[in-house]
């Protein structure tokens, strides 16, 4: 363990985000890198449901949060909303995400391996495993900034505010503008026709 890594972890331990990670009761993977996040050992995650682990790498502290979660076949994570941004990448499995505002109608979109999406800020969302194999996902968040700024998890996870971005996303989800898969690609990812406009070089 290098001095750089020790100093990095020491600076993280005094933050509201670090205390919150510890209170969640799941493993925290620390280091300079992770060879394969699909192989990380997970623990039961009472708040979110399923299993999970935080990933805290040198250089991320204070700015970026990361976690890996797993959903059993036919299972689902608990609904949540939060006052920080989150980008989710599906590593394995198939399923769907429900998204809704407080008192509003639920919208649903499906995903598969390597789907990438971001629930609108502070909207309720729930991930559901619709397949016969475990779903494993990785998420990158701005939770460290939010938790260190507000220092109040109750406010972060139970704020009634509906943000302008969430209102705009309602229309985007209910009235999609295009196809889930690019028209120039099939399910194998191989081009079926040239995606370049005529005359392009």
Name what the model sees in each region:
Residues 1-62, 155-201:
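A short, N-terminal "cap"/entry segment at the start of jelly-roll beta-barrel domains
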Residues 68-69, 79-81, 85-90, 108-109, ...:
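His/acidic/aromatic-lined binding-pocket segments of jelly-roll/cupin-type domains
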Residues 55-59, 76-82, 99, 108-109, ...:
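Short histidine-centered beta-strand/loop micro-motifs
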Residues 60, 101-121:
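Short acidic-glycine-tyrosine-enriched beta hairpin
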Residues 48-54, 65-82, 201:
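Conserved short histidine dyad/triad with adjacent acidic residue
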Residues 110-113, 121-150:
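Ligand-binding loop in jelly-roll beta-barrel domains
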Residues 72-73, 83-102:
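Glycine- and acidic-residue-biased ligand/ion/polar-headgroup-sensing regions
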Residues 76-78, 96, 115-127:
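Histidine-centered metal-chelating micro-motifs
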């Amino acid at each position: 363990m290098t001095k750089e890594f020790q100093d990095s972890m020491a600076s993280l331990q005094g933050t509201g985000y670090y205390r919150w990670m510890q209170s969640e009761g799941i493993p925290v993977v620390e280091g300079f890198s992770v060879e394969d996040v699909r192989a990380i050992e997970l623990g039961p995650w009472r708040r979110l449901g399923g299993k999970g682990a935080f990933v805290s790498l040198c250089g991320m502290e204070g700015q970026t949060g990361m976690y890996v979660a797993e959903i059993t076949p036919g299972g689902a994570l608990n609904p949540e909303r939060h006052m920080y941004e989150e980008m989710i990448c599906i590593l394995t499995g198939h399923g769907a995400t429900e998204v809704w505002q407080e008192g509003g109608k639920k919208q649903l979109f499906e995903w598969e391996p390597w789907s990438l999406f971001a629930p609108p800020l502070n909207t309720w969302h729930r991930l559901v495993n619709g397949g016969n194999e475990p779903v494993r996902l990785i998420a990158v968040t701005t939770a460290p900034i939010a938790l260190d700024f507000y220092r109040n998890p109750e406010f972060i996870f139970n704020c009634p505010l509906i943000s302008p971005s969430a209102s705009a996303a309602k229309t985007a989800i209910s009235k999609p503008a295009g196809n889930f898969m690019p028209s120039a690609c099939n399910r194998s990812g191989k081009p079926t026709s040239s995606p370049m406009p005529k005359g392009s070089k």
